[in-house]
Amino acid sequence: MDWTKQIVRYVVVMMLQVLLFDQLQLWGACHPYIYILCLLMLPITLPRSADLLIGAAVGLIMDIFCNSLGIHMASCILIMFLRPYILNAIVSDTDRLNEQICLRAIGMGGFIKYIGLLVVIHHLTVFMIAAWSWSHLWFVLMETVVSSIITILAIIGYNSLKYR
């Protein structure tokens, strides 16, 4: 794996998130967080501690730029903790994945399940912590659904273009 290429790609995705997607307020309830693409596409051969540290670092960077007091960090650590379990539940033979998780490696159905579950968990965590109240539950659920759909479509589009 070419780490320089990966790092440049992740910096570009993070910059797009901060400069473009964070400024985008679609319908007041859509907040696409494409930066989690960086986490979901990490090689599966990384040690578990590295996964969690990278998740914490990416979340911290987003918290700094979004002024969100640890919300993204908590959400990123959670999805990085759950990632291997979800991947093992979806893909029966993780040995065939080599190093990279991509559309081509696990097929469209598996890829959508993998991305979909982790994106929904991330978004639900972000919006629940931000609301910090059960009184806003319906708005949080609406925000989660709309934002997750847009984020999932963006990640699938990116992955389709990348591995064409």
Language-model-detected regions and their locations in the chain:
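Terminal, non-globular segments
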Residues: 1-164
